[in-house]
Amino acid sequence: VTVGGKEIRVDANVSTILDTFGEPNRIDQTEYGFEWYVYDSNYSEFCMVGVEADRVCALYTNSSSFDFNGMKSGDDYSKTADYLDNRCYRFYADSEGHLDSILYNPRYRGVDDSTSVKRSKSMLLLDMINSYRSKHNKTIYVEDSDMNAAAWLSSLDFMNEKEYESDVVTQSGYDVFSVYRQLLESD
């Protein structure tokens, strides 16, 4: 995969990534046992490189400049057909059927669900959303710890109500996919 003309190869030594991309802006823990090296200083070249035992083991990008075996961001999603049987690769399309992002992760299930991993996931989601928003010329979001704390407490209160039913979450707007879609589409 290339991002902004810079190559990322699975199984490459981490020193190659550091020489090519520089020091990551952040290193996040994952539930899969490896670390994400997060490059988010320029959302038009946003990428995350999974590193374990000093080797590249995973990658993700939704950069507008990515290229993977001749497939580029914005190409017709049908170009990914050759990889349908390869569970290590996941390709994501935008609402118009164009290739939007690629994930290479040979691990299917994570085992670590610690507080630090949950925090990392929230930061990664914010970066992925901001990269998408940047690609579509929308204002990026800035993390607000006070708002995060208030939202967390509000969701805990909601979930602890005695009359809680599983479908109430979806009906009330707490459905994570609905929230994600609203974040991507809002100005």
Feature locations, PLM:
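Functional surface patches built around histidine and acidic residues
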Residues: V1-D187
